Design a protein with these regions (language model features):
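Small-residue-enriched core segments of transmembrane alpha-helices in multipass membrane transport
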Residues: 46-67, 78-85, 146-161
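Short helical (or helix-break) motifs at transmembrane helix termini and adjacent helical loops
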Residues: 81-100, 121, 158-163
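Hydrophobic alpha-helical segments
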Residues: 115-171
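Extended, hydrophilic extramembrane loops/domains of integral membrane proteins
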Residues: 1-6
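Interfacial segments of transmembrane alpha-helices in multi-pass membrane proteins
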Residues: 15-71, 137-141
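Interfacial helix-loop-helix hairpins and adjacent transmembrane helices
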Residues: 159, 163-198
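Helix-loop junctions and hydrophobic alpha-helical segments within the transmembrane domains
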Residues: 100-126, 183
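Residue-level signature of catalytic and energy-coupling elements of molecular machines
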Residues: 14, 33, 62, 90, ...
């Protein structure tokens, strides 16, 4: 027998307006992030942006293959996925910049930057993944839609941030093509900040 697990009634006009508002906020947030990454990280920011767009294609393709409909919780999951993907790239890039400030060459700095940023990225995504599984297991309706988008997004984000960008960087370095991780303006930003939390 059929069992109703969730029921929400929204007028067609209101539902369409909500979807449009959610999509508009998604586009604005994406545009701001893309611009900021290029402004702050220059060439590496462009690589990050390409990885982010590829990540979106992977995620939307996976959702389409599952026959998922675009809902507000789904849009929220996509936006959160973008944030997590950017966070992973920022962790890697800041680690690389730190290695470069320590006097290491670009190739060594990139290798060490990725290897030393792995644990923080995996830990952050693993805890979020566990939370998403709990939401999917005990939630219903819209909550499950959000959790599904988030679970898929975590895997696509890890792939784009850890695998895709690494391949691009090492391909360029092996072909003696330069990569910049900062602009002249942002080179020394936040390097002398020392917050005494205790």
């Amino acid at each position: 027998p059929a069992r109703i697990v969730d029921e929400v009634s929204v007028g067609p006009q209101l539902g369409e307006e909500n979807i449009q508002a959610g999509f508009s906020s998604f586009v604005i947030a994406l545009a701001v992030i893309l611009l900021y990454m290029v402004f702050y990280y220059k060439g590496a920011g462009l690589v990050s942006n390409l990885a982010l767009i590829a990540n979106l294609f992977f995620l939307i393709g996976a959702l389409a293959s599952l026959g998922a409909a675009l809902t507000l919780p789904g849009i929220a999951g996509i936006v959160l996925t973008i944030g997590m993907a950017v966070d992973a790239n920022v962790l890697i890039y800041e680690r690389i910049r730190e290695e470069m400030r320590g006097g290491k060459g670009l190739m060594v700095a990139v290798k060490d930057g990725y290897s030393k940023a792995y644990s923080a990225i995996i830990d952050a995504n693993l805890t979020t993944l566990l939370t998403a599984f709990v939401l999917y297991s005990f939630g219903s309706g819209a909550i499950r839609g959000f959790a599904t988008t988030l679970i898929i997004g975590i895997f696509t984000s890890l792939f784009s941030a850890i695998v895709w960008t690494r391949l691009v960087f090492f391909s360029r370095l092996e072909n003696k093509k330069p990569i910049s991780f900062y602009t002249d303006m942002t080179k020394n930003w936040f390097t002398k900040i020392n917050v005494n939390f205790i």
